[in-house]
Curated annotation (Swiss-Prot):
Protein name per the record: Glucose-6-phosphate isomerase 2
Entry's localization field: Cytoplasm
Pfam families in alphabetical order: PGI
Gene that this sequence comes from: pgi2
Alphabetized NCBIfam families for the sequence: PRK00179.1
Keyword Isomerase: yes
UniProt keyword annotations, A-Z: Cytoplasm, Gluconeogenesis, Glycolysis, Isomerase
GO BP, sorted A to Z: gluconeogenesis; glucose 6-phosphate metabolic process; glycolytic process
Length: 551
């Protein structure tokens, strides 16, 4: 029991009921469940916005879902959700509100933080972004030499990179193809080198994304980009203001860098980095797709926000997806979760979800600071189909691990493809549907034998099935649909964190390595003695210096 008198999660009757249910359920056979309920394939579906969600191929019964709903009620998921939407400080370790939902609220909404409606601030920044994006897109904004901007390079890291980079790839078919967009995040100098090596400085705009303007990787890359620009434009310091803008709140450091603070786009402490690409952090995306399509994306986010906030528990899609994740992770022993989009344009979607999910729920203490006695966030992984089918699907089909998976697909290819390329879409989606069937129902030894397979090969060609999947299907990938998908996963992650009683909105795990890196760097560059360096790391530092030719 916690100090406040609350029963800890694993000691609640609802948790105990699920443990008992898991024992009684035994081995779940999807073939048997579908045979017993012919309507399962059509009845176990939900819809939110443009997303058709099929959860029939999961290792759950009606009783499982009912018990999970009781767990959600007992752990106060809806209360914490409502507190988040109200602007309460639910990020307890940093004493901050969590209001990424305000970033896509309509102009007439009222959402208060400490008694102040933040929606007018949000729309003021969006309007400022739109004005700037239009000036770049039309050629009104020119560089130092008077030439129009044709290249945009976003420099950020974490949420300042993963979100806009993912969304740009997802919405390439909606971008202005006359503009080249690149994203730099790695402090490895090769990242910036490859991003700018074929660009003309006179036509290149850099967007520096750092709330504090002190993020070491971002400012290191920004400083190198500044040197590259000045070297290419004759060294005139005035050029910086025409080729750099900032996504930040630190006006002093932005000005010191040479950026005009009139071209600084702000965001707020109640926006976490991994939830931020629909804020000023998305400026590069807005330049690429235009303000109108950016707003369509925000409307897609808001649609799912409202669904999550108002839909009854039994038809609430993010709640359902979160509960299924808790079922597999906390009761069936699953350690990972695969997200498998059958769309080339979603090639960076799973990498984006890795930060969203693992940085949020990769925690081992609860909100009271006590070690958890239950499994929390899974390892999230995956790549677009059909590539994965020729790589790791073997392990999912016939390996020894339980790996729940989400399959995301679209009924229509993007319009700009040729008719011949559009015709390939049916083959792509045939694989999409075939894989979920194969994972669910497998292939029995008798079915293998019926094909005349030699007996010694029968075990090798048998597929056990009973691998759970969620299928998410939409008509086509549009800005609105992308917003809906991202919001769906945002709120799924929220649900799981609420049930596990962890703070899903801090990320202290990234801090220790940063601190140690600052201490280690002088040992690499100067050979300085670093107090507290363990023998293994000390030996590795010495080996590094020798390989670098430093004694």
């Amino acid at each position: 029991m916690n100090a406040d008198g609350r029963t800890r999660l694993h000691q609640t009757p609802e948790w105990a009921a699920l443990v008992k249910h898991r024992e009684q359920l035994g081995e779940v056979r999807l073939r048997e469940m579908f045979a017993a309920d012919p309507g399962r394939g059509t009845g176990w579906t939900l819809r939110v916005g443009d997303l058709h969600v099929d959860y029939s191929k999961h290792l759950v019964t009606d009783e499982t879902l009912a018990l999970l709903q009781e767990l959600a009620a007992a752990t106060g998921v809806s209360g914490l959700r409502d507190a988040m939407f109200r602007g309460e400080r639910i990020n307890i370790t940093e004493d901050r509100a969590v209001l990424h939902t305000a970033l896509r609220a309509p102009r007439d909404a009222v959402i208060e933080v400490d008694g102040e409606n933040v929606v007018p601030q949000v729309h003021a920044v969006l309007d400022k972004m739109a004005g700037f994006a239009d000036r770049v897109r039309t050629g009104e904004w020119t560089g130092h030499t008077g030439r129009r901007i044709r290249n945009v390079v976003n420099i950020g890291i974490g949420g300042s990179d993963l979100g806009p980079a993912m969304a740009y790839e997802a919405l390439r078919a909606f971008t202005d193809r006359s503009l080249t967009l690149r994203f730099v995040s790695n402090v490895d100098g090769a990242d910036l080198h490859e991003a700018v090596r074929d660009l003309d400085p006179a036509e290149t705009l850099f967007i520096i994304a750092s709330k504090t303007f002190t993020t070491i990787e971002t400012i290191t890359n920004a400083t190198s980009a500044r040197s590259w620009l000045l070297a290419g434009l004759g060294g005139d310091e005035k050029a910086v203001a025409k080729h750099f803008v900032a996504l930040s709140t630190n006006a002093e450091k932005v000005a010191d860098f040479g950026i005009d603070t009139a071209n600084m786009f702000e965001f707020w402490d109640w926006v976490g980095g991994r939830y931020s690409f629909d804020s000023a952090i998305g400026l590069s995306l807005m330049i690429a797709i235009g303000p109108d399509r950016f707003r369509e994306m925000l409307d897609g986010f808001h649609l799912v926000d409202e669904h999550f906030r108002t839909a009854p528990a039994e038809s609430n899609v993010p709640l359902l997806m979160g509960l299924l994740g808790v079922w597999y992770g906390s009761f069936l022993g699953a350690q990972s979760h695969a997200v498998l989009p059958y769309s080339h344009y979603l090639s960076k979607f799973t990498a984006y979800l890795q930060q969203l999910d693992m940085e949020s729920n990769g925690k081992s203490v609860d909100r009271e600071g006590k070690p958890v006695q239950w499994q929390t966030g899974p390892v999230v992984w995956g790549t677009p189909g059909t590539n994965g089918q020729h790589a790791y699907y073997q392990l999912i089909h016939q390996g020894t691990k339980l790996i729940p998976a989400d399959f995301i697909g679209f009924a229509r290819p993007v319009d700009e493809l040729s008719e011949e390329l559009k015709s390939q879409h049916d083959l792509l989606m045939a694989n999409f549907f075939a894989q979920t069937q194969a994972l669910a129902f497998g292939k029995t030894p008798d079915e293998v034998r019926a094909e005349g397979v030699p007996e010694e090969l029968v075990p090798h060609k048998t597929f056990p099935g009973d691998h759970p999947t969620t299928t998410i299907l939409a008509r086509e990938l549009t800005p609105s649909v992308l917003g809906q998908l991202v919001a769906l996963y945002e709120h799924k992650v929220f649900v799981q964190g609420a049930i596990w009683n962890i703070d899903s909105f801090d990320q202290w795990g990234v801090e220790l390595g940063k601190v140690l890196a600052k201490r280690v760097e002088p040992a690499l560059t100067e050979g300085a003695d670093v107090p507290g360096l363990d023998p293994s790391t000390g030996a590795l530092v010495a080996a590094y210096r020798e390989l670098r030719g430093r004694r």
